[in-house]
């Protein structure tokens, strides 16, 4: 494995700066490095470990990929590269159908990046100063980087904090907002734990708790009380179940899905058929129709689209059958407590209820409202007119190549985003297959020949 070039200068210049060294940033760097001199690129990341980000920095073997290994290659034109890497190591999954541990994929991406010769600067960007059609990036140590173009690849923000969570709760160590960071404490062996959320993050935290020896009852609370569905055998249909010429309304989209199910198409195949065209279908909807989908259908779509690996799904079935996992509907309105534990106040359609917990962990979705995210760089981009919020107030508004729209309605010639930061304009933008396609499109746009 080659050593990654690490730069340390008070002031330097680069052709393209990539802010963020997680999966999104590294995928961008790998694709760009195939079309231009890697020495003209610079990945800026404060953490020493690159490529893994939040999802792939886990060290828990039970945390599995939610995509089959055969579609997890880092390069858009080589989706089976991960399988080839596994085979070279003797780790199996050569047929590409397995759901491998996420930490292995993080290791794979780091290995591919290590041979790219893309320089790395281990700093944190705190401010971005526009300089014509380029930018000066200011680091937290006072150094600066002059970049011809800048790619924002900071990944996910923390989830929205639980309301009415007072200082007693915050300082107790019993409430964890950043569940992927080091926890201030572990729950008592048999004391109850409440996970706010019942999606894939909550599943991961349950597995982490069990791996650490916790044997108590875990209660997941979410608005709809739905768990992710499980992956099944690979199925396919010859065309998307929603034709591109369908009248762009939520009702018509749903009508075509129901027709396909009535004709014998499995729900998994129907959902998977839409993955290549979901962003195009989403772009055709009006703001009103997008809001209608978010309100009435998104929770159903999300559980069907973002599925559990089969071994994980079997584990969850066992947890529920034994009574060690309980899933309830409701909205956590407040958390209070004292040195003995926490009291969780939940509002549900059938009424209010309370739960006592030794610990409460926030497993809800990352916050996409950058107006309230604790990130000075993001706030400055909006304040200076370099960025505007995207669909329904989330993340950034970007064009088809990831370029940010400014307050003047114009597309930036030098500022781009990739990955979860594009949720303001794209429906699918968080999974590796979609992010690597964005990386390829960006590299082709910036370097057409």
Label the predicted regions:
Residues 34, 49, 70, 74-77, ...:
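Short helix-loop boundary/capping segments at the starts of domains
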Residues 57-81, 236-251:
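N-terminal glycine-rich dinucleotide-binding loop that anchors FAD/FMN and/or NAD(P) in oxidoreductases
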């Amino acid at each position: 494995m080659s050593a990654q070039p690490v730069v340390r200068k008070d002031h330097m210049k680069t052709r393209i700066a990539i802010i963020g060294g997680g999966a999104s940033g590294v995928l961008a760097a790998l694709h760009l490095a195939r079309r231009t001199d890697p020495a003209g690129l610079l990945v800026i990341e404060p953490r020493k470990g690159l490529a893994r980000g939040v999802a792939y920095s886990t060290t828990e073997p039970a945390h599995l990929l939610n995509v089959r290994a055969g579609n997890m290659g880092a390069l858009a034109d080589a989706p089976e590269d991960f399988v080839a890497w596994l085979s070279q190591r003797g780790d199996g999954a050569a047929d590409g159908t397995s759901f491998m541990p996420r930490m292995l994929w993080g290791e794979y991406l780091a290995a591919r990046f290590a041979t790219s010769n893309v320089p790395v600067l281990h700093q944190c960007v705190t401010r971005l100063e526009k300089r014509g059609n380029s930018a000066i990036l200011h680091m937290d140590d006072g150094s600066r980087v002059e970049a011809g173009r800048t790619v924002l690849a900071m990944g996910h923000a923390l989830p929205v904090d639980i309301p009415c969570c007072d200082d007693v709760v915050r300082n107790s160590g019993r409430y964890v907002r950043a569940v992927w960071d080091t926890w201030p404490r572990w729950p008592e062996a048999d004391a109850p734990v409440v996970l706010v959320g019942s999606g894939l993050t909550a599943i991961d935290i349950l597995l982490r708790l069990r791996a650490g020896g916790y044997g108590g009852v875990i209660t997941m609370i979410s608005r709809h009380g739905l768990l992710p569905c499980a992956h099944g055998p690979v199925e396919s249909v010859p065309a998307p179940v929603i034709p591109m010429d369908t009248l762009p309304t939520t009702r018509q989209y749903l009508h075509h899905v129901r027709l396909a199910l009535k004709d014998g198409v499995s729900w998994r195949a129907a959902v998977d058929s839409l993955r290549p065209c979901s962003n195009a279908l989403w772009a055709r909807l009006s703001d009103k129709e997008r809001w209608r989908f978010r309100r009435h259908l998104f929770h159903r779509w999300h559980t069907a689209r973002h599925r559990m690996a089969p071994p994980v799904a079997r584990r969850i079935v066992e947890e529920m059958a034994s009574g060690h996992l309980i899933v309830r509907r409701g909205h956590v309105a407040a958390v209070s407590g004292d040195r003995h534990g926490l009291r969780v106040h939940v509002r549900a359609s059938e009424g209010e209820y309370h739960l006592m917990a030794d610990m409460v962990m926030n497993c809800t979705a990352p916050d996409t409202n950058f107006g309230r995210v604790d990130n000075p760089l993001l706030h400055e981009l909006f304040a200076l007119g370099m960025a505007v919020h995207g669909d329904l107030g989330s993340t950034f508004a970007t064009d088809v190549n990831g370029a940010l729209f400014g307050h003047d309605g114009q597309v930036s010639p030098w500022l781009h985003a990739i990955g979860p930061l594009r949720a303001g304009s794209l429906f699918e933008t968080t999974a590796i297959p979609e992010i690597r396609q964005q990386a390829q499109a960006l590299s082709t746009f910036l370097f057409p020949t």
